[in-house]
Amino acid sequence: MSAPGQHSPVVAGTVRRYRVTHTTRYTYDDVVSSSYGRCYLTPRALSDQRVESSQVSVDPEPDDRSTGVDVYGNSDTYFHVRTPHDALTVTAESVVEVDPIDQGLLLSAAALGPWEECRPAGTSAPVVEFAMDLYPAEITDAVREYAAEVFTPGRPLLEAIVDLTNRINTDFTYRSGSTAISTRVATVMARREGVCQDFARVALACLRAVGLAGRYVSGYLATEPPPGRERVVGADASHAWAAVWLPGERWLAFDPTNDKLVDERHVTVAWGRDYDDVPPLRGVIYTESSSSRIEVSVDVAPIDPAASGNPANRASDAH
């Protein structure tokens, strides 16, 4: 592994095309009379990501459903199932095309200039919102100390972000099941372990601790099996990373879990201030059931040969 801040230059990739299938199945030990759900499972249409098709299906068929766009521009789907059921399945299928990382962004004056110049002071309110701490507060003394080691005076923003990405990847252990959705950043900092959404939230707390604007991004990561092994359908998972704002309304996305800048292997679904703004699926049920089980299957399948051949990466088990 390279020393912090000394990574090799990013090599331009090629356009990738994927078929993404995300299936969530709930089973209950008693009949559910009514289920309400809201999900963020539709990839965003972006300048570097084109959504060729996307649909969300629910079984049993909902009695009521609608789609909309939230305050951050994310597509969401709402549904209400009133048919009595003991299992509920939500499946999202999309075909997306993703461009390589923008070399112009990496070579921009903002990316190569002092990080202090990327603070959003005096800019529009929506951007400033991403620089504010959450409630309850996530910026602790430990976060400030960790961020101060990275964001030294006058350091180029890109260099600092690459260093932060590498430090989190090095200092924290990826351990599936070690945290829950409700786990606080302070706990992750103390334990030095977690999964992708934890590492993204640590990165965001560090950005905000020094006055930078950062957003939480949910999506998928195309993964490759070990050499000699066949690709297992459904073995992928939801993923999460962070992005920092640059003047000119541009964002530089980075993936601490895999120690890399976000590129054509990442499929962006939604973004917000934190995980709570964009959970893949959230809902309420009415039942006498005392227990339930959730099974999640995610498959990010390359549609053409050019989309395979990427090194093994880690995605999260956050559902």
Positions of predicted regions on the chain:
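Secondary-structure boundary elements
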Residues: 111-117, 121-194, 202, 210, ...
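A structural signal for short, well-ordered beta-strand segments
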Residues: 22-24, 92-94, 164, 242, ...
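Short beta-strand segments enriched in hydrophobic/aromatic residues
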Residues: 28, 96, 246, 300-302
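A short, structural micro-pattern
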Residues: 18, 33, 50, 84-88, ...
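Intrinsically disordered, low-complexity N-terminal segments that are enriched in acidic
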Residues: 1-117
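Alpha-helix N-cap/helix-initiation motif
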Residues: 13, 189-193, 231
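Hydrophobic/aromatic-rich core segments of domains that either
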Residues: 2-5, 166, 198-286, 293
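Short hairpin/turn module used for nucleic-acid contact or packing/dimerization
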Residues: 13, 277-319
